[in-house]
Amino acid sequence: MRPLFVRRARQLVTLAGSSAAPLVKEKMSDLGIIENGSVWIENGTIVAVGPDDELVRRFADRLAEAEVIDAKGKTVTPGLIDPHTHLVYAGSREHEWTMRLHGATYMEIMNAGGGIHATTKATREASEEALYEESKRRLDQFLLHGVTTVEAKSGYGLSLEHEIKQLEIAKRLHDTHPVDIVSTFLGAHAVPPEWKHDPDEYVRLVIDEMIPEVSRRGLAEFNDVFCERGVFTPDQARRMLEAGKASGLTPKIHADEIEPYGGAELAAEVGAISADHLLRASDEGIRRMADGGVIGVLLPGTAFFLMTKAADARRLIDAGVPVALATDCNPGSSPTVSLPLVMSLACLHMGMTPAEAMAAATINAAHAIGRAHLVGSLEPGKKADLVIFNVPNYMQIMYYYGVNHAETVIKGGKVVVNDGKVYI
């Protein structure tokens, strides 16, 4: 494999020096930008990062053997990282969207046969091959938008058989697609219809059967619970998260999206790596998250699509909570694969600056899925995941919103996207 030399970026956004801990407060604005910067890559790993003239001198005797990509006038960043998606699912729910546009409530949509249970039904009924192909098409779109690592949750199976099916497809995608997938078990996404009259029995099923089997098969690293009134209580969530910890699965939690319900506090209590959504998190919950180093994964695309007020990122950042951004890609509340659009929305609706949004979609996102030692920044020893954006500075990635500026995507030192085409 020839060395790869990415040269002369007008802005090289490195985010170097932040692998040990996520960025917080004013440190989220320190992007480590190198003007006229270059990256030398060997065997899929970053060897050197710095000003172009410095690297040209250092590798002068090897320039002839290297593959060279000239990024003059463009912006190079780490590969973007999406730490909260529901990647593997079947079907579409645009009919619910039109109902919502006409004023239908969540419960009205549920009673009409929609919501999570509609996707659960479609996902259960889909063949493994059909589910793989549909999810692969979505993953291709993530890659085209500059995303090189994705967290993927289960949660549309809601039975042992079908949760395993989702996680096995996520593993197959990880093994066959350039995008790295980090899997999360979300058997506690909702109470399935067959258990609606005995939700505690479903909780027992998750604890006694699903979690041990997922762990035994090595199909997930994380265990997530949707902790909201009418779904799972804090006590039920605590029991499932502690059971996951006992089986080696690190806790995550869908927290305080609809009302202050103690999800942020619970995340700190159980040592969760992240608490996600947080639109209605209490001041005390935010304080405990900051004290415990729990990452707040914010999902502005979801609030945008649901036409509701977004989480207050400024409140979390100023309190010292490390913040990451994610698409929440799912068919009901955030049908998007564009993390750059989410970054724009974070600036427009959450009070974040472009610098903070960039940090939140790279190194802090890597921390939120336990991958900061491998990806999320451009520095020697890390995996060579880079994106070349056809803009002169990183702010324009978000400023020209709704436009895919990702021109070239490099994954593990290989060009996997160029001029709008995926090469696998």
UniProtKB/Swiss-Prot annotation:
N-formimidoyl-L-glutamate binds at Y156, N330, G332. Binds 1 zinc or iron ion per subunit. It is found in: Cytoplasm. It catalyses: 4-imidazolone-5-propanoate + H2O = N-formimidoyl-L-glutamate. Pathway: Amino-acid degradation; L-histidine degradation into L-glutamate; N-formimidoyl-L-glutamate from L-histidine: step 3/3. GO terms for biological process: L-histidine catabolic process to glutamate and formamide; L-histidine catabolic process to glutamate and formate. NCBIfam families: hutI. This is Imidazolonepropionase. It comes from Geobacillus kaustophilus (strain HTA426).
